[in-house]
Swiss-Prot record:
Protein role: Inhibits growth of calcium carbonate crystals. May inhibit growth of certain crystallographic planes in the mineral phase of nacre in the shell.
Bilayer-spanning residue ranges: none
Stated name of the protein: Perlwapin
SUPFAM superfamilies linked to this entry: Elafin-like
Keywords, alphabetical: Disulfide bond, Repeat
Organism annotation: Haliotis laevigata (Smooth Australian abalone)
Tissue: Nacreous layer of shell.
Amino acid sequence: YGPNLPGCPPGPYPRICARYCHSDRECKAGYYCCNTGCLNICVPKPKPGLCPAIRPGPCKGNVCSNDQDCPGNQKCCGKPGCRRCYRPEKPGSCPPRKYDAGVCVIYCVGDFDCPGNEKCCGSCPRRCEKPCFD
């Protein structure tokens, strides 16, 4: 319950305040009560994980509006008007890069091309590596 939780709608807010919920218990399963200061509404809880880095490209409109619109563990990611369902990044960060010389080979595109908890790291070469945790 609070104004800065993920999934709370951005302003501007209506001039007429409304309280559709007072706590998370009043929302259906998978939702929580979002307090924007003037408007309390039940919004879908975001799925765990982070959105992957999204390559710029042509925008063909929104496919999803929130994580609940996406199948399985996929998340609704992207800028407004270009939102799509993506598999989330795995936790952790890529280790510092050592100098790579030689052939540029792409072994993975995203984290879910990698086994276990390994992440897809680097740009050239791009390969699966064990993550670092801060």
